[in-house]
Amino acid sequence: MLKLLFIFTSLLSYDSSSLNKELQRVFVTATIYHAVEEQTDSTQNITASGYEINMADPLSDRIIAVSWDLENVYGFKMGDMVYVSGTGVLDGIWFVRDRMNKRFRKRIDFLVPQAMKGGKWENVLINHRRSSGR
């Protein structure tokens, strides 16, 4: 019985680490991009985080690129999981794995297949958990 109590207490303390995080709700402009040299760089199959894109089905990777201010001001980090809403077709869970050009502010880019053309949404909501220490 004591062993079960210890395991249960350990699980509770592990779960409580999520209490040390605060929810960020940020409204951004969202656009799409393709893994092509004209829109990225000469290593279009590798993101800024070093993640290798599934070139046969880039949408399956659920990758977004974020503007620098989302990293520096709002605490977004490479590998973070975010929930995006306000686009309709692209709403859902995405992973921060790429970075946009410094000229963009409060903006995300969805990595999509080349067959998907056009796409710009205003006032897209991103829900993101960040550590309270940032």
Name the predicted role of every residue range:
Residues T9-S13:
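Residue-level signal for alpha-helical transmembrane segments in multi-pass membrane proteins
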Residues M1-I7:
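Sec-dependent signal peptide recognition
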Residues Y14-R134:
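Solvent-exposed, well-ordered loop and adjacent helix/strand elements within mature globular domains
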